[in-house]
């Protein structure tokens, strides 16, 4: 995959070249998207809109730390949707990991989560965030046990994953309403890189065959159900709904 690669560390140790080789990235000086290695982290920038800033994965500080400490925990919609109850903490495959936020919420309340991400740039961002998270004194211990990254396309990997999870979680990119003020700066950068998941409808069936209990699909409230398969079961929040489908028991 071609992207502009920029090293701002000043270290001159070739770390960016190693990273590019690992994730199959090729430097393209004219690409509008840039993957930048800073002294602190790896980040994604949209070069024609510098005011949008850089996107990076941070499980330790910022919004994720606040959500971990002061968020709803088990009361969060995604936790309710996957079926967390009492001692039941399902094993989850997040087949559209993105920046790992929902996966992190589930891991922070006790679920073991395997994240799938097919875009190599996003996978590199996730891997960088995980490495910093694993090294953190406060959360590193449980994060290593509960949150892992698999760099693969969900369309093929969903048939190969073992052991089977109890829950498969899907949050495919859906085109945002153009005038929506809710399309945050971060989303604009992210969508410029990955675009909408045009093949997302193909995920539902393999997800239902893989999950032993249920499949949860996060959708904007204005979006049709995935693959146009309706379900009466959903957890509804302001702006979104989590559609729930039966899996395939062992």
From Swiss-Prot:
Its EC number is 2.1.1.242. Keywords: Cytoplasm, Methyltransferase, rRNA processing, S-adenosyl-L-methionine, Transferase. SUPFAM superfamilies: S-adenosyl-L-methionine-dependent methyltransferases. GO terms for cellular component: cytoplasm. It catalyses: guanosine(1516) in 16S rRNA + S-adenosyl-L-methionine = N(2)-methylguanosine(1516) in 16S rRNA + S-adenosyl-L-homocysteine + H(+). Gene3D superfamilies: Vaccinia Virus protein VP39, YhiQ-like domain. It comes from the Bacteria. It is found in: Cytoplasm. GO terms for molecular function: rRNA (guanine-N2-)-methyltransferase activity. S-adenosyl-L-methionine binds at residues 101-102, 117-118, 153-154, 171. It holds the Pfam family SAM_MT. CDD domains: AdoMet_MTases. InterPro entries: 16SrRNA_methylTrfase_J, SAM-dependent_MTases_sf. It is an enzyme of class 2 (transferase). Specifically methylates the guanosine in position 1516 of 16S rRNA. Belongs to the methyltransferase superfamily. RsmJ family. This is Ribosomal RNA small subunit methyltransferase J. It comes from Shigella boydii serotype 18 (strain CDC 3083-94 / BS512).
């Amino acid at each position: 995959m071609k992207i502009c690669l920029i090293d701002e560390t000043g270290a001159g140790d070739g770390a960016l070249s190693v990273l590019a080789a690992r994730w199959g990235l090729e430097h393209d000086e004219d690409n509008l998207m840039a993957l930048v290695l800073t002294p602190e982290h790896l980040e994604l920038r949209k070069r024609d809109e510098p005011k949008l800033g850089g996107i990076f994965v941070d499980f330790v500080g910022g919004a994720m730390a606040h959500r971990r400490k002061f968020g709803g925990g088990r009361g969060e919609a995604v936790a309710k949707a996957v079926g967390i109850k009492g001692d039941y903490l399902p094993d989850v495959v997040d087949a559209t990991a993105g920046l790992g936020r929902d996966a992190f919420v589930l891991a922070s309340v006790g679920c073991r989560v395997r994240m799938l991400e097919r875009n190599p740039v996003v996978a590199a961002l996730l891997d960088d965030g995980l490495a910093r998270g694993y090294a953190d004194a406060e959360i590193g211990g449980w994060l290593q046990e509960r949150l892992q990254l698999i760099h693969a396309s969900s369309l093929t990997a969903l048939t190969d994953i073992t052991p089977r999870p109890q829950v498969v979680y899907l949050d495919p990119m859906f085109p945002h309403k153009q005038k929506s003020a809710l399309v945050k700066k971060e989303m604009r950068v992210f969508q410029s890189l990955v675009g909408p998941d045009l093949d997302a409808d193909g995920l539902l069936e393999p997800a239902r065959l893989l999950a032993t209990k249920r499949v949860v699909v996060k959708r904007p409230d204005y979006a049709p159900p995935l693959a146009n398969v309706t379900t009466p079961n959903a957890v509804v929040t302001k702006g979104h709904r989590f559609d729930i489908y039966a899996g395939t028991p062992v």
